[in-house]
Amino acid sequence: MDKGINLQNDKEPSPMAEGNPADFSAHTPMMQQYLALKAGYPDTLVFYRMGDFYELFWADAEKAARLLDITLTQRGQSAGQPVVMAGVPFHALENYLGRLIRMGESVAICEQVGEVGAAKGPVERKVVRVVTPGTLTDSELLPDKAESMLLAVHQAPRARCGLAWLSVTQGVVHLAECTHDEVGTWIARIGPSEVIYSAGVTERFEQQLQALRQGGVLSCPLSLRPDWQFDGALGARKLLEQLGAASLNAWDAQDLAHAHAASAALLSYAEHTQGRALTHIHAVRVQKNDELIALPPATRRNLELTRTLRGEDAPTLFSLLDTCMTGMGSRLLKTWLLEPRRDRTEARARLAATAELRGDHGGTGSWQALRAALRGVSDVERITARIALRQVRPRELVALCKTLHKAEQIAAEHRWQDPLLAGISGDLHAPPACGALLAGAILEEPSALVRDGGVIADGFDAELDELRGIQNHCDDFLLALETREKARTLIPNLRVQFNKVHGFYIEVTSSYLDRIPDDYRRRQTLKNAERFITPELKAFEDKALSAQERALAREKWLYEQVLDQLQQHVPALTRAAQAIAALDALCALAERSLTLGWCAPQFAAEPCIEIEGGRHPVVEARLAETSAGAFIPNHTRLNANTRMQIITGPNMGGKSTYMRQVALIVLLASMGSHVPAAHCRLGPIDAIHTRIGAADDLANAQSTFMMEMTEAAQILHAATPHSLVLMDEIGRGTSTFDGLALASGIATHLHDRTRAFTLFATHYFELTELAARHAHAVNVHVGATESGSDIVFLHEIQPGPASRSYGIHVARLAGVPAPVLNHARHALSALEERANEGETQVDLFAPPPESEAPGISPVEAALQGIHPDSLSPREALDALYQLKRLAQPG
């Protein structure tokens, strides 16, 4: 593609470049207007509407040309500089916006709002909206199954953080507070599309955010905002204004000053991008760490909940679960999956609702009929948000009207006994006035945009009907006029016609020009014809064109009136959207449970994970798809007496699959889904921690072993007796002795101190001795058997430790050359013989001498009592002198 003029080596200075004065008087009037608008959006690409194109200038043009592969050119001069520009057609705006947003860019849309020629100078323009990755509302830019989430992070004193986030299309502000160390877990949970934070954060906090970005936890654009926007008092006032309340007590959000500060910046930024108040934001939800089951970033990654280890959307647990008929249902189902609650109330309610949809208590079940009814339902949630923001398109209103009618039918046809389903049924009833307004106001097949006309239904407005009548009778008038003029002039091929450039005219070929009457006035000369206008035709033209313009203006005004009337229905429409989404998600859970043969879990008050015939849901589905055989189910029994399994066995035997399936079954049960097992009984769970796999983090200069130890340390600090911990091959990233020693220490700590439910897979057979020395640990292994020179993996979890590893057999299956295998067999025999002749084995699990336990030095004790963010300069200096005195010998 032609890239236009190459300006890379001879760039003209941008008028907005640093150091250039803000005086634009030397520029042309058009460029003065552009530069004044651009000054308000220095870090944003400004799409400046000029006729049928959106133009970009100078640095914006160069950047857009590079990112979008569009032509970069120069046209004319302004203030003595060539005007560097690039443009895109207005009708292709959404396509280019989508590409830029996916690249993490933000775009300000500048439209012509004044009438051309109405005033001296350039037509009036203004920025009508700013499109950023975290504030998307356009259905063309948003994926059906994902939210565009904006997150504001406020760094507070004493290593605390305030978090506030929202999806503009949902209209709910979420609040949370956490420590600096917990920010990564919260970001992984929220999955933001854009993060804003204060320009006044400390260097260390900035480095932490960048580290999260480089590590893949934070994979979205970061935007700095002025420090003054993060004001707690301002945030509290803004929240009260949105809620129309005098107190935040009803939402349990009154004592969250740090989160209030984040919400101040969040709401200001969101309003700035939409160009108006967010009137549809009607709720605040406070999220607390102790309410949710913790799923750290490593857990989400290793369990492949929504993304595979290769970064693909499927096959994952969510891709297997999601058979929803609507985008709303898919998004809600993902939220249930990624935000399971420790309290079982919601999970029990979903299981009970699913049971009725399945027909477990008698009857045929209603899930199939409901899924058929939900097919083709529009995205009410996003349409409602666009109504509130006055951005909704006519065809979206038609789709909304049809969906509301369908929702009424669903509610009328089903009478559920389950409380959750009964509540959903009640919310499906939208106000009758809303449906009547939509049906009466909008044509069944309207134009795509209001500016094109053809949107308001006939009979809705008498004045519009009259104006349309004038336009609709144009053809009759023109035909009658043509007939009369032919008779009057005796010109047989005379034609009365219309085009957008010249309006109405009478066309006469050159051979009949001698018959032209005196009242014909020449309008245009063609090669073989002349075009004329008469006083009568001119009068009709004025009337018809005036009617067309007035009708279009009337339609625009009426459309705005319809939006005004719809505002009162936004809360009810929001409830209807939530009800449709919940019903869709529950039907998907019902369908999956029946299709895949899953069972309903049971919840217990005492600590336990009891699974009979458990299967890995994704692996089982893949085996079924590829006809690769049946999945081998396994049992798991962890309780107060058995808290740890030491898992040994060959590679490819299924250790990792078994561990993951236990975690996935626990997660599915906790979200309120049936589970892939014959029976499941689950006690309280507060977190799922995993350390699986090995890979260098080159971006952060961390080796495989460093990554391994970092994740292990995080688990050892965070896990509790109610946590599920998966440890796979810990210690393999270093030498054998170091790895074995560390693995034994970690296993002992998890057993003796943490007391978490632990699945500990290892190739260190020495670790199997732990079960003999520790009452709450047991040995299990994945079965394998030899058949001649071959090995058969049974994929069964069997009691006791493995007898051998079969590593050389696995190497042969992988295609390692025969000479290498022969050498390995010889070396293995020699090593085993030497081991048998060696000294008595070291006791890995003997407690270390008390004297070896490091104490806390006076300097360390003093450091623990210092909170840098809360110190004044004088206090910091005093603390430094105190540390120096403590560090001096003697």
From Swiss-Prot:
Top-level taxon: Bacteria
DNA repair in keyword set: yes
Compositional bias (Basic and acidic residues): 1-13
Alphabetized InterPro entries for the sequence: DNA_mismatch_repair_MutS, DNA_mismatch_repair_MutS-lik_N, DNA_mismatch_repair_MutS/MSH, DNA_mismatch_repair_MutS_C, DNA_mismatch_repair_MutS_clamp, DNA_mismatch_repair_MutS_core, DNA_mismatch_repair_MutS_N, DNA_mismatch_repair_MutS_sf
One Gene Ontology term, aspect cellular component: cytosol
Residue ranges of the region described as Disordered: 1-23
Pfam families tied to this protein: MutS_I, MutS_II, MutS_III, MutS_IV, MutS_V
Gene3D superfamilies xrefs: 1.10.1420.10, 6.10.140.430, DNA repair protein MutS, domain I (3.40.1170.10), MutS, connector domain (3.30.420.110), P-loop containing nucleotide triphosphate hydrolases (3.40.50.300)
Transmembrane segments: none
GO biological process: one example: mismatch repair
Keyword Cell membrane: no
Keyword tags: ATP-binding, DNA damage, DNA repair, DNA-binding, Nucleotide-binding
SUPFAM superfamilies xrefs: DNA repair protein MutS, domain I (SSF55271), DNA repair protein MutS, domain II (SSF53150), DNA repair protein MutS, domain III (SSF48334), P-loop containing nucleoside triphosphate hydrolases (SSF52540)
Example of a GO MF term: mismatched DNA binding
Residues annotated for ATP binding in this entry: G649, P650, N651, M652, G653, G654, K655, S656
Purpose: This protein is involved in the repair of mismatches in DNA. It is possible that it carries out the mismatch recognition step. This protein has a weak ATPase activity.
Family (UniProt): Belongs to the DNA mismatch repair MutS family.
PANTHER family in the record: DNA MISMATCH REPAIR PROTEIN MSH1, MITOCHONDRIAL, DNA MISMATCH REPAIR PROTEIN MUTS FAMILY MEMBER
Protein name: DNA mismatch repair protein MutS
Protein's organism: Paracidovorax citrulli (strain AAC00-1)
